Swiss-Prot record:
PROSITE patterns, per the entry: HD (PS51831)
Residue span, HD domain: 50-147
Superkingdom: Archaea
Protein's UniProt name: Uncharacterized protein MJ1154
Pfam families, per the entry: HD, HD_assoc_2
Annotated signal sequence range: none
Matches recorded under SMART domains: HDc
A GO term, aspect molecular function: dGTPase activity
Biological process, per Gene Ontology: dGTP catabolic process
Amino acid sequence: MKVIRDSIHKDIYLDEKELEIIDSEEFQRLRNIKQTGLTYLVYPSANHTRFEHSLGTMFIASKIAEKINADVELTRVSALLHDIGHPPFSHTLEICGYSHEVFGRKKIKHMNLDNFSKSEIIKTLNRKNLEGKIISGDVDADRMDYLLRDSYHTGTAYGMIDLPRILRSITTFESFGKVKIGILKKGIQAIESLLVARHQMYSAVYMHPTVRIADTMIKRAVIKEIQEKNLDIKDLANMDDIALVSFLRISENYLMERIDRRNLYKNLITYSYFDLNPIEKWIFVNLDEKQILSLESRFYEEFGWDIFIDIYPIPKMEEHNVYIISDEGVKRLDEVSPLAQSLKPSEMRLWNISIYAPKEKIKELRENNVKDRINKILKELDVKVESKLIDILKEYGTITGKRRFLEIAKERGISPKEFYNELHKLIFCGLIKERFNRRTYVYCLNNFVKL
């Protein structure tokens, strides 16, 4: 048994089998992968890594597993390995089809894990069992650790949550033959604090304008090297931050040179959530990486400079789905918490589309009618609003109950994962209206939008 001192959780105990994993080459790589990408350019002390976050996630996950009588050993080792496939600078470089989950599974298959079942670990990381929901779910160990850790290392107080009370409030219940994780009614305030913490951390840290600009620049720097065949997307799975930065410097990548000097691009134009109509939002959130790069090529043709477009991912708001257990039965957090409901519009307000240009060209571009010219290019996008869920609502008019909606969708060949992802996007964009009535959700098309 060995004790590791952690800045967040203090003493973390590890047994010999876990130490073997930590001492592996694959896990040691995480020591040099920053947890929050290029956030250190704004918050200088944000130099913490995926290494300590993985330890922290294991610590919290094991506490939850003990509380709900899950497999503690499987939970701990799976939590340790949950980020093993991350590329340099973490989520920032999940580009060109790179998925840290996919590469993580590949690494696990090739690691020396004789003391554990690789298939069970992969099953857990795919959220196919209770242990997987502990690590990554509606209220999970991963999220709780990164909020506490990122808050501490950025020097902000926004991510502070009542971890002990959340852990005391976690329980399980059975629904349709499956064991699910929920929160006792006495823990509502603690879960609400988690919602607020996440919202504030996204606003102040993860979506900080300068952080987003730096992240976009490093993405484009790496994409350029991949396009020129100097780098393969698979290489990222074995590189850390140091290796990648060294490669970009040797390649004399001009964007890396600018990042090194903190000579960052500046915000040229911002489109907020409320600047765009539902169809425009739908078009933008469905643009893939290839289409975005094509747009940027059009900008270059028009202006003669690299101008980047940054479309922030739709907020997932998973915590709103947390089950609250009381004497009255099981309800979702949204049903019992006015605060949770009020945060949904605030989450939407955070979302925007930003267009960046070299700071030395901002004045010149603005003097040359840049916004109208960019708007003209954006209007050339030919993306149709196509959705099987919209087709279903055109046929049914109104559907009462999310489960009923899912059943109809499954009959049309739509998987549950596709259903939930598509529904979330459609509601976010304002193409489908969701309202809560008499303890159930009701869905219909937004009649103010012509489809």
